[in-house]
Curated annotation (Swiss-Prot):
The keyword Cytoplasm applies. Its main location: cytoplasm. InterPro entries: RdgC. The lineage of its organism: Bacteria, Pseudomonadati, Pseudomonadota, Gammaproteobacteria, Enterobacterales. The keyword Repeat does not apply. Belongs to the RdgC family. Keywords: Cytoplasm, DNA recombination. This is Recombination-associated protein RdgC.
């Protein structure tokens, strides 16, 4: 089981019936296939259980996990530039004239087509967890763009997907700043030693603190000067450490060893049973964390 490292959280904006059996059929039409000789990139669905299953969905207790794979061909710019320049120089020498921009653009396309079959590929996978009980979708991505790209593939597969980023009633950066200023956090949360502070004005600078006592005069001076806490490392229930960000994302999730070891009594050779047990454990913990985080940040914005 791949334990999620980041959470970009989205709210289903209207009631949608998502079930694994129906999704299985819909996702299969967009299953991953490798790049052909002239493809720059390909994206599609693969089994969240890897080679242990052919199913594109895995569901337990109303929780569904799916996985998108992306293949990208790597063509370094210097290689393209070198090949293109050689072609341009050869043709200009043969024709005794300077090539027009449109001709150079056409040559660049030719160069790309000739290089693609020999290009190396880069692969990445993005897991998505759909909580049908709480109408939430979580993407294991550190950036909004990667999360949105994966949601776009799911939207294309399902035909529609009415989701919006999870937002709070109060600006998150104001809440985080007050936590650091006062040194008081809601029950269950303990401040750690890492944060990012930004000035309200765009050109006012950014301060990134690591291994720093955040409840200190030094940090208080920055807050008094108008800087806001935009990222804050916290510990939740001594079970999960994470960084809360002002965009509502939960980054760099680190599960306590005592938590991850709870299913060690299950034979690791029984992959399906261990995957099930770890998925149930992870999603139940993260669902509780998300619920507590929403409450701690002042509640979700009313739609």
């Amino acid at each position: 089981m791949l334990w999620f490292k980041n959470l970009m959280v989205y709210r289903l904006s209207r009631e949608v019936a998502l079930n694994a059996d129906e999704m299985e059929k819909q996702l299969s039409a967009f299953a991953f296939t490798p790049c052909g000789s002239q493809d720059m990139a390909k994206t599609g669905w693969v089994s969240p259980m890897g080679s242990h299953s052919e199913s594109l969905t895995h569901a337990v207790n109303g929780q569904i996990v799916i996985c998108a794979r992306k293949e990208e061909k790597i063509l370094p710019s210097p290689v393209i530039k070198q090949e293109l320049q050689a072609k341009i120089e050869r043709l200009e020498g043969e024709q005794h004239r300077k090539l027009k921009k449109t001709e150079k653009d056409a040559l660049k396309d030719e160069v790309l087509h000739s290089l693609l079959p020999r290009a190396f590929s880069r692969f990445n996978q993005t897991f998505m967890w759909i909580d049908t009980v709480n109408d939430l979708i979580m993407v294991d991505a550190a950036s909004a763009k990667r999360a949105e790209d994966t949601l776009a593939l799911l939207r294309k597969s399902l035909g529609s997907l009415p989701v919006v980023p999870l937002t709070m009633e109060s600006p998150i950066e104001l809440t985080l700043t007050e936590w650091v200023r006062s040194g008081e956090l809601p029950a269950g949360f303990i401040i750690q030693d890492e944060a990012e502070l930004k000035a309200i004005l765009e050109d006012g600078g950014v301060i990134r603190c690591k291994k720093q006592n955040l409840i200190s005069d030094e940090i208080a001076v920055h807050i008094e000067a108008g800087k806001l806490v935009t990222k804050l490392a916290v510990d939740w229930q001594e079970r999960i450490q994470l960084v809360l960000a002002d965009d509502g994302s939960l980054k760099r999730l680190k599960f306590a060893d005592t938590l991850r070891e709870q299913n060690d009594d299950i034979d690791r050779d029984d992959f399906a049973q261990r995957f099930d047990a770890d998925f149930i454990l992870m999603t139940s913990e993260l669902a509780a964390l998300i619920k507590n985080t929403i409450e701690a940040l002042g509640g979700e914005a009313q739609r």
